[in-house]
Amino acid sequence: MLGLYAAYGLLDFVRLRLLVRIASRLYRNLHQRAFAISVLLPLKAGREADRLNPLRDLDHLRGFLSGSGPTVIFDAPWIPFYLLVIYLLHPSLGALATIGALAVVALTAVAEIFGRGPARLTSEAMISQRALAESGRRNAEVVHAMGLSSRLAGRWSDIVHSYLAHQERLSDIIGGTGSLSKALRMALQSSVLGLGAYLVIGGEASPGVIIASSILLGRALAPVDAAIANWKGFLATRHSYFQLKAMLDSFEDPVEPLELPRPQTRLTVERLTVAPPGTPKPTVLDVSFQLSSGAGMAIVGPSGSGKTTLVRALVGAWKPLNGKVRLDGAPLDQWAPHSLGAHIGYLPQDVELFDGTVADNISRFGGKSDPKGVLAAARAAGVYSMIMHLPEGFQTRIGEGGRALSAGQRQLIGLARALYGEPFLVVLDEPNSNLDVEGDAALAGAILAVRQRGGIVIVVAHRPSALTNIDQVLVLANGMVRSFGSREEVLSSMTRPPVPATHRPIIPTQRGVSGHA
């Protein structure tokens, strides 16, 4: 008997080790895809991305699989076998055990039906908690300077109260069904013992039947008890599984396209219509133009005219609803992402740097193999001297988001990152919003250098200093091109006094104005 128990313990230990290895293998196989999806989610799902976290869902799956929860799945198929053996010992004992087991299973179904809603609401409240905490931490300066701490704390308190209310309700449901299950199991085992004793007294069974039926009933009900005990984790894991599966299905691994040659001649935009991710209403409508190598173009227009939307589509960050962006005739979606990234330099309106060194950020985390490229990009952006004055130069760690740097320093390092590797297309969204006079001069020099080496520069401009070394201007209004041409022509037309209404010639309205360099 001791040998059997030892064998049982050894097999259970082996099973748990196998589950841990399976969970680790699943994580190793999916963690890169989950990370890639988490990075791309804001570009695909828009605001919906705030509640999605594939890495968290994958971690939930790994944690559940490496725990005791999955053992229920392996033990549950043995329940009918144990009940059958009890029935063979005596039909009356088998009938009683079967009725009791069905009652315990019914309690599990009750926990599933009534616990599903609170589990979902608990998960949503937890996501809201994390989002608010991250937002407050990211905007700590604004929170402190404008006295928002108490208001954010009040909002946090509301979310926490909601979370705790849903959590308490879920715990009450799981705990209540668990307590009922435990009471029912004790009553059932007592009933089996009593019925067995009655059968023994009546000469219908041997005394050993009492012990055997009690042990077998305990083994039959063990998976159900374990299921109820782990039900809260099971509900969360099931939610994570379906959510992760939906994201993996939506973000299928792209087919690696043929490696295309480095672009050298032109950028072509054909009837481009773009909407922010997750919204059906376009903010850029029917935009067309073409730029040749060596060109420098500024995009100007009032706030909300679609300038940032347009440049996000030009670099491939946002997918257009209609139209194409082409480099040397090839649409952006025909380029492998890593290859396309090497040919594009992008400085967004809100400069986001990563936790790492200055060199890591400039080199797009590939600088250990190309230190000369890092130095060249820093000099091209006019930021070399500033970096040399940092505590550890290029090896200075800048913290998440570049919090160790000023806004102007972040912008210049972001410019150096955009220039790293001498990309063919350089897109700068309000690159001088935080720059001083020296920074403006460095920006103008960088734009000229890109044009002189045969690249194309596109600048979203609000300040006149950003138009230095720019030869063409595209004017956007309400998402449509209002004017496109040489800088002198467009700027003079923008400053020309309007023609009085009584003398203004009637000109047919045209949409989708396009120009060619």
List the predicted regions and their residue ranges.
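Transmembrane helices of ABC transporter permease
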Residues: 1-12, 71-122, 194-205, 222
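Hydrophobic alpha-helical segments in the permease module
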Residues: 2-12, 100-103, 174, 178-188, ...
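Short intracellular "coupling" helices and adjacent cytoplasmic loop segments at the cytosolic face
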Residues: 24-25, 32-58, 132-155, 230, ...
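An intracellular "coupling" helix at the cytosolic face of ABC transporter transmembrane type-1 domains
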Residues: 43-44, 57-65, 69, 117-118, ...
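Cytosolic ends of transmembrane helices, especially the final helix of ABC transmembrane type-1 domains
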Residues: 148, 172, 220-247
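Helix-to-loop junction immediately C-terminal to a conserved catalytic motif
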Residues: 315
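ABC ATPase nucleotide-binding domain helical subdomain, centered on the C-loop/LSGGQ "ABC signature"
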Residues: 334, 359-400, 444-445, 449, ...
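Conserved signature/switch motifs of ABC ATPase nucleotide-binding domains
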Residues: 421, 453
